[in-house]
Amino acid sequence: AEYRIPTLDTWTSYVGIIDMVVNEYDKYKMYFMNVANDFALATLYVDFGKDILADKMGWKTTVVMQEDTAFGGGVFELVDQMLAPEAGIKIIDHIVYDTNTVDFSPIFNKAVKSKPDFIYLISSVRSQVPSSQYVKLQVPVPMTGINVAAFGKDFWNDTGQMGGGTSTLSPIPSVGFAMDDRTQAFVDKYEAKYGNSRPIFPHFNGFNAYYGIYNAFNAAERAGGFAPLDAWVTEMENEDLKIYKDGKLWLRYAFWKPGEIEPRTQREYTHNIKFDITQPLDDGAPSMVVIQWYEDGTTAVVYPEKYKTGEFTVPSWIKQ
């Protein structure tokens, strides 16, 4: 704000930043966030928990395994405050582990002794370790949650091909996602140039960064440049990049304008990406999807229904 520099934030989800834009628009109007904020992400935790974990699978209890980081603590608060009461799932134990942990057998044993219906993992640092040990130990309880390492195609080799059964919330597009033609062309170009180095696939914020640059430069072209600032801000607010697949709106890179109210949460999200968190998701892209790695190394989107390319399953060693 001090330097009045046009800013496109491609990976921060903290809703407090968006609230600053809402509350002090003139001061922060040059800031745009093109990933859905925490409030929007939380709705997917709840919807997946209710529709799949509770209603489809019949699961009612969980043990949360959370890394000892600020990220882990923040996600646990959302899960504790929203997933449990709104999806009807009870947290019967909460295990916090050090990110330098190399032996997860005592942690998994503790979780299993509580006899939960499933384990909810929250991991962003060295997530490959609990993932591979979950398979190696053949932990007899299903596990889902947030596993950042599983966002990328490198995950399978990083786990020594022991990532089967892992499911996680993921930004979009994701591994296992049905790509539209334009996005597939970007993936093909990326893999041709960088496919032999890490990451081998443009995961995490790669896609929203790519399309966000189009937003920023298209706005600048119409405004006559990035300065004067007000002209660029106005054109960024008018940006609306819609991408279709098979006649359906598939991805959307636009921004909430000042005064617009998101209907489900009844809040303003000025300059946040224009996500859609109300079924049937026909006005924008969802805040996230849920992906799953299968035991043969393939992946699929398992939720929400519109983007589903496979079924949510439990590992073969678990008898339901």
Report residues per predicted region:
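Extracellular/periplasmic periplasmic-binding protein-like sensory domains
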Residues: 14, 35-39, 134-211, 221-222, ...
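Segments of small-molecule ligand-sensing domains
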Residues: 193-203, 217-302
